Amino acid sequence: MDAVACIYLLFRRANAFAPDVTPPARLRRWTAAFFAILALGHLWYLPTAVLTSPDAIMLSMLIGGLLDCLTTIPVAIIILFCMLQDRRRPLWPPFVMMLPIIIGLVVCMINCNYDLLPMMRVYMSFLAAGLVIYMVHSVRQYGRWLRDNYADLEHKEVWQSFLVLAAILTMFGIYVSGFGGMAYEYIVQVCGLFLIFYLLWRVETLQTLEQTTPLPDREGLGESLPLSLDEIGQLLQQHCVSTQLYLQHDLSVADLARAIGTNRSYLSQYFSRKNTTYNTYINNLRIDHFVNLYREATTAQRSFTAQQLASDSGYRSYSTFSLAFKQRMGQTVTAWMRESF
């Protein structure tokens, strides 16, 4: 199954889960490598099934653990890094983190002495705790970066993925540690299958955030100009609000900055000084647009649905609109429409 998933990611050009999404190529390649390593992992643990000597079995397990530390664990961490697209993180730290374990395993195999194993388990526990702390901080930082740069967050947020992956990896950790008995062996097999399908889904539904279709600069401005807060506010009113540019799907802060003739840094500073984010600014405009459409439709006694009005207000996903509406208005769409009728 792992090998099939690897071949699928390497050679299939189109997405099966989300055909309209272009996933990060870096994430796709490293996930394919991870599946290839999982497939090979069955081979380097195979001798333990035929060996009878306890010492030989222990040596075989140590060799398998060494290969996992060289490949499986670092590549799994790299996949997590590749999901975060706010910056291009270096990929060598996961390999460096595993060096003490690798050295310890080599020493154990050479000396046929396993006294270092308890210390290595303690190191792995601290390493796992440190990685969790780092990833929680990075995911929170990534969420802020998304809200500062993108109006639409569909196929961009990743925090749910880390919760699911953390649960799956915890099950694997319990199994590898020897706790849990035979029941966990069957559970881990199920988790392994779920991990394959979940990673495939995650890779194919995560939108790459590289700029591919930039908007042209506003005529006559050329390079970005330093502007005051009042000037930026006027330009936003003129080139975003009046033109209803906020209705454009996947409008990024860089797109908007080019449209008004400044750069993203000045525009981000503007939103920061207004104690808001770019995402909140665009969502507020879209919700105001929805309210206007609703009032026009009710006044003219036209038939409509909330889903259609949300789509006309710039939202691809009704669930995203519902969440933004509740955050802005303090109540659900249904409750607001009932009170406004």
Task: Kindly give the residue locations of the regions a language model identified.
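N-terminal low-complexity or simple alpha-helical regulatory segments
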Residues: M1-V106, I110-N111, L116-V122
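Alpha-helical transmembrane segments of multi-pass integral membrane proteins
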Residues: P19-L40, M97, M120-F197
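Hydrophobic alpha-helical transmembrane segments and immediately flanking/interface helices
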Residues: D55-V75, A183-E204
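Alpha-helical transmembrane segments and their immediate juxtamembrane interface regions
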Residues: P74-P90, L195-P214
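A cytosolic-side transmembrane-helix exit/cap motif
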Residues: N113-L117, R140-R147, V203-P216
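Membrane-proximal linker segments that couple transmembrane helices to downstream signaling/catalytic modules
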Residues: W201-R316, T320, A324-Q327, Q331-F341
